Amino acid sequence: MQVVLRQAIPGLGKPGEIVNVKPGYARNYLFPRQMAVRVTPGILKEQQVRLEQEAARKLAERQQAENYKTALETIGRFVIRKKVGEHDLLFGQVTTSDIAEVVLATSGLDIDRRNILLNEEIKKTGVYPVQVKLHPEVTATLRIQVTPE
């Protein structure tokens, strides 16, 4: 018997998925607990429309991430000013929060600091490449320039 899940069920599927289950399982467990409904032609059409809308939304998100990537990479360098001691060593280090603030101030794009990936700790002045994950499939590479105050 085919049913549409209303909520996530471990080992069976996610909400909105159409799955095959045994009739007894559907009648005695899923239907009484309102975890699933029987598949009808109307529900199939509704499901198809929902899937198309979801695909369009994901495509729009990816396109927007590509636009942000292009905008960020055309800026060139993002400059961060920090206090410096001997041998161009910073007092402290450049954090992902610092990078997010500079990107917001320079480009107006608010990036979550958890999406910024540092290959190495930034403890000296210089230019460093930094990866920013804008979308699960889109990653931008920024150039961060650390200069003395």
Swiss-Prot record:
- State the InterPro entries in the record: Ribosomal_bL9 (IPR000244), Ribosomal_bL9/RNase_H1_N (IPR009027), Ribosomal_bL9_bac/chp (IPR020594), Ribosomal_bL9_C (IPR020069), Ribosomal_bL9_C_sf (IPR036791), Ribosomal_bL9_N (IPR020070), Ribosomal_bL9_N_sf (IPR036935)
Alphabetically, which GO biological process terms does the record hold? translation
Its Gene Ontology cellular component terms are: ribonucleoprotein complex; ribosome
MF terms in GO: rRNA binding; structural constituent of ribosome
Cite the Gene3D superfamilies for this sequence.
Ribosomal protein L9, C-terminal domain (3.10.430.100), Ribosomal protein L9, N-terminal domain (3.40.5.10)
Q: Which UniProt keywords apply?
A: Ribonucleoprotein, Ribosomal protein, RNA-binding, rRNA-binding
Write down the Pfam families for this protein, in alphabetical order.
Answer: Ribosomal_L9_C, Ribosomal_L9_N
Which protein family is it in? Belongs to the bacterial ribosomal protein bL9 family.
HAMAP family the UniProt entry points to: Ribosomal_bL9 (MF_00503)
Role this protein plays: Binds to the 23S rRNA.
Recorded protein name is: Large ribosomal subunit protein bL9
Query: What gene does this protein come from?
Result: rplI
